[in-house]
Curated annotation (Swiss-Prot):
Result of altering residue 91 to S: Loss of activity
Effect of residue 91 to A: Loss of activity
The reaction(s) this protein catalyses: blasticidin S + H2O + H(+) = deaminohydroxyblasticidin S + NH4(+)
Family: Belongs to the cytidine and deoxycytidylate deaminase family.
Transmembrane domains' residue ranges: none
Name of the protein described by the UniProt record: Blasticidin-S deaminase
Enzyme class: hydrolase
Record-listed Zn(2+) binding positions: 54, 88, 91
Effect caused by changing residue 56 to Q: Loss of activity
Length: 130
């Protein structure tokens, strides 16, 4: 299914974000997310040998700080023309927990961008029963 204009805009914004910073091992992925009220939030990962947040998690924090509410779609773009990157397992779990209705833009089997529900990417996510 073709991307909507809003979804295509997310790819453009994340690409512009990662291309706006110098090539670096410390900041190699940008993410953009769309809120239900139409705002777009961007961010980049912060690599450090002790660990660090992925770009998607940085965007979640930025959106939360702006009282964005529900996020409806998210994408990650790698530097050096790597294009769309699928969320890692940790990000999939966090997205499922915090925004269970969110879609992530990933590449389909033909390498084309497509937006899929987070539950499709993580059908058997961890459920804490505390």
């Amino acid at each position: 299914m073709p991307l909507s204009q809003e979804e295509s805009t997310l790819i453009e914004r994340a690409t512009a974000t990662i291309n706006s910073i110098p090539i670096s091992e410390d900041y190699s992925v940008a993410s953009a997310a769309l809120s239900s009220d139409g705002r777009i939030f961007t961010g980049v990962n912060v690599y450090h040998f002790t660990g660090g947040p992925c770009a998607e998690l940085v965007v979640l924090g930025t959106a939360a700080a702006a009282a964005a509410g529900n996020l409806t779609c998210i994408v990650a773009i790698g530097n050096e023309n790597r294009g769309i990157l699928s969320p890692c397992g940790r990000c999939r779990q966090v997205l499922l927990d915090l925004h269970p209705g969110i879609k992530a833009i990933v590449k389909d089997s033909d390498g084309q961008p497509t937006a899929v529900g987070i539950r499709e990417l993580l059908p058997s996510g961890y459920v804490w029963e505390g």
